[in-house]
Structure formats: structure tokens, C-alpha cells
Amino acid sequence: MIGLVGRKVGMTRIFNEDGVSIPVTVIEIEANRVTQVKTLENDGYTAVQVTTGFKKASRVTKPEAGHFVKAGVEAGRGLWEFRTEGEEFTLGQEINVDIFTDVKKVDVTGTSKGKGFQGGVKRWNFRTQDATHGNSLSHRVLGSIGQNQTPGRVFKGKKMAGHLGAERVTVQSLEIVRVDVERKLLLVKGSVPGATNSDVIVKPAVKA
């Protein structure tokens, strides 16, 4: 089963039958329109390419326009591809959120919020050094980052200050709380990566 591309609307909470508050992320999943079907003979693997949303005609390049016209679909805000195993799709076909009706858990992939250049405490959860007791300069610094003349260098992969966020992140096995087909919404328990209105990819959980 393939996944779908949606848009993170934000977080809220709903109450179950026992009155327990459940934190949920609302994902809007408009119809995913098939723009290309890749086959083993032509492409060396099987996959389906989809688009969703809409893009102003003035923002669509000529190659993109030709691609969308060939598929017989309206230009979308991007193109995404899902590998297929035996499923059959046709150009212009619309895939909706109702495919998750019988799914219990999903994996959600998005681009995490960019935090810029951050230190070791925020980036790696390092503990801070003494606030007093003679320490006046090194409250949030890393401390030792190596050994001695041997090896005489800092090992690759050492956790240090640097750029945090703005990377592809997948959160696995999020429970589906509700599928609202009419409003094209998917409610999953917990948080998902990315800012409000960012694109996310929702797939059936691999560990379910």
C-alpha cells in the first residue's frame, strides 16, 4: 500500500468516550492525483508519482506544464513518488484519505523546523556545567572533545555545536485517531515533524 502527501494543519486535542484528552495532529490530505506510473520495463522499477494541491499557472515551468498535461491533471504544488508492489494505477486517478480507513498506525515524514546554529546543550541535550563554584566562562560549553597527543585529533561524528533542524525526519507508528473523509482530514495521536502548513508524507507503519 502506498502513502499519501498531506499538509500539517496543526495540533489540537479530542476526547474519547471515557473523557480522556488525546493530543492529536491534524493532517489535511487532499486528493493525490497520479501524474506518472513507472514500470519495470521502462524505468527499471515500479512506482507511482503523484501531485496534490494547486499551483498558479504563472509559477508552472514549461516542462512541468507538459508533464501535467500529459497526465491530464491540474498542476500541483509538487511531485512525490511511492514505490509500488502489485498495485495498479492509471494517469489522472485520484487517491483519497479513505485508504487509511482500515489502517491502525502510520509513519509520518516531514522536514523538521530549522533552528539555525545551536550549541551542544540544545542540539544534543548535554548537561550544563556548574553555575558557580569558580566557573565563570564555561557554563554551556562542551567540555573535553578529545584525548591527547594520541590520537591528536577530534573523532568524526563527535557531538558538537552546529546546524539544528531543517532535515528530513520520520516519526514511526503514530496511532490513527480519526479519518474524516468528508473534510479530507487525518487525525494522528502525538506530534509530527515540521511547521504548520508544511508538507508531510503519511504511510502505513512498517512496524505495525
UniProtKB/Swiss-Prot annotation:
Q: According to the UniProt entry, which residues carry N5-methylglutamine?
A: 149
The coiled-coil segments of this chain are: none
Q: Which UniProt keywords apply?
A: Methylation, Ribonucleoprotein, Ribosomal protein, RNA-binding, rRNA-binding
Post-translational modifications = Methylated by PrmB.
| Gene Ontology terms describing biological process | translation
Instruction: Report the GO molecular function annotations.
Output: rRNA binding; structural constituent of ribosome
What is one GO cellular-component annotation here? cytosolic large ribosomal subunit
Q: Which InterPro entries match?
A: Ribosomal_uL3, Ribosomal_uL3_bac/org-type, Ribosomal_uL3_CS, Transl_B-barrel_sf
The UniProt similarity line reads: Belongs to the universal ribosomal protein uL3 family.
What is the protein's known function?
A: One of the primary rRNA binding proteins, it binds directly near the 3'-end of the 23S rRNA, where it nucleates assembly of the 50S subunit.
What quaternary arrangement does the UniProt entry report? Part of the 50S ribosomal subunit. Forms a cluster with proteins L14 and L19.
What name appears for this protein in its UniProt entry?
A: Large ribosomal subunit protein uL3
